[in-house]
Amino acid sequence: MGQVLPLVTRQGDRIAIVSGLRTPFARQATAFHGIPAVDLGKMVVGELLARSEIPAEVIEQLVFGQVVQMPEAPNIAREIVLGTGMNVHTDAYSVSRACATSFQAVANVAESLMAGTIRAGIAGGADSSSVLPIGVSKKLARVLVDVNKARTMSQRLKLFSRLRLCDLMPVPPAVAEYSTGLRMGDTAEQMAKTYGITREQQDALAHRSHQRAAQAWSDGKLKEEVMTAFIPPYKQPLVEDNNIRGNSSLADYAKLRPAFDRKHGTVTAANSTPLTDGAAAVILMTESRAKELGLVPLGYLRSYAFTAIDVWQDMLLGPAWSTPLALERAGLTMSELTLIDMHEAFAAQTLANIQLLGSERFAREVLGRAHATGEVDDSKFNVLGGSIAYGHPFAATGARMITQTLHELRRRGGGFGLVTACAAGGLGAAMVLEAE
């Protein structure tokens, strides 16, 4: 076991997570169509503060993230402060770590708490796949800049004459990695082939995810942590996630064609997480500050780790890299965990990470460790379903996982939970949570 790194303040306080909340998650272009991420963020933070009954002035910092950036609101965190009635002097800044963005936001607030610069803060993220920054071609962009500097009408007309019809076409946001040109689904296909993960295994995991998420809603387990969203024209509120298949059937999964490798692929729309809109946030405090305010924390942040790997091969193996580091820093082993929640970007990616966490060879030859991180116990894994069912508003998923895991730990009488995710750019994140 390597060095244990306790997350405590200089006074010995643990980092408490006192509350967490999210909007329902909605598939792209459905319930939240036309609602920008900043409005989703304001919605969830405003409701989180109202439910917690914590005075707004108690919150000294807000760190928030958004992956699909909107040029008109580059600092979503500050817009949330200004749009929710929070103290105007509240420090606020934005972060981005792709699919691990709200993990990063939580880590940043935790570091401020440990440094002693704040005693309470909010971390979270919001994304909209329905309100997108549609761009213009590089040629048109250059001409528009030059036109702005032109002094006469003839100069402007001459510049516009250089354009062709194709230059006027809108440019949608890129879905491929900037550095490689590969889509995440391409990497998921590569990992499925490399690690021998079959179509049947992927479909079975997706089916399991939907079944468990549907059961979680049916049992009322998510009611406390998901707000009701009222959206224009205010005729029908959104109460639950709208991606979950309550009648999920394995036979239906088998009918779908591959989405990326059309001839030989196994990754489909059904065994991948869909584009989603939503927001999530958590309130963090020092343990002593929570006691002063008479608050009972949901749990505590025990450790965290971020890793980075090559983007050309196995780019989505972030959990297999970051998990052993987070466990090491927490002073725990895989067998001591009560719950494991892994982000399901793709069923193939999830199954590959599970396989390698239990691989002695991967531990020795790739991680340089003496032993495997540990086998993933199915009875502890994604017990309420995962991102394939709930959906994945990129910057919000981490905060969803943290809140969901802490509530489930408390229902089980406490223990330790691992939350972990892969992210674009070969990034990985893992956090160990503790509940009493």
From Swiss-Prot:
GO MF assignments: acetyl-CoA C-acyltransferase activity
Listed pathway(s): Lipid metabolism; fatty acid beta-oxidation
Major localization class: cytoplasm
PROSITE patterns per record: THIOLASE_1, THIOLASE_2, THIOLASE_3
UniProt-listed CDD domains: thiolase
Localization per Swiss-Prot or TrEMBL: Cytoplasm
Active site per the UniProt annotation: C99, H392, C422
Transmembrane segments: none
Keyword annotations from UniProtKB, A to Z: Acyltransferase, Cytoplasm, Fatty acid metabolism, Lipid degradation, Lipid metabolism, Transferase
Gene3D superfamilies: 3.40.47.10
Pfam families: Thiolase_C, Thiolase_N
SUPFAM superfamilies per UniProt: Thiolase-like
GO cellular component: cytosol
EC number: 2.3.1.16
Origin superkingdom: Bacteria
InterPro entries tied to this protein: Ac-CoA_C-AcTrfase_FadI (IPR012806), Thiolase (IPR002155), Thiolase-like (IPR016039), Thiolase_acyl_enz_int_AS (IPR020615), Thiolase_AS (IPR020610), Thiolase_C (IPR020617), Thiolase_CS (IPR020613), Thiolase_N (IPR020616)
Catalytic activity: an acyl-CoA + acetyl-CoA = a 3-oxoacyl-CoA + CoA
One of the GO biological process terms: fatty acid beta-oxidation
Function description: Catalyzes the final step of fatty acid oxidation in which acetyl-CoA is released and the CoA ester of a fatty acid two carbons shorter is formed.
HAMAP family, sorted: FadI
NCBIfam families named in the record: AcCoA-C-Actrans (TIGR01930), FadI (TIGR02446), PRK08963.1 (NF006516)
Quaternary context: Heterotetramer of two alpha chains (FadJ) and two beta chains (FadI).
Protein name in the entry: 3-ketoacyl-CoA thiolase
Organism: Shigella sonnei (strain Ss046)
Gene name of the encoded protein: fadI
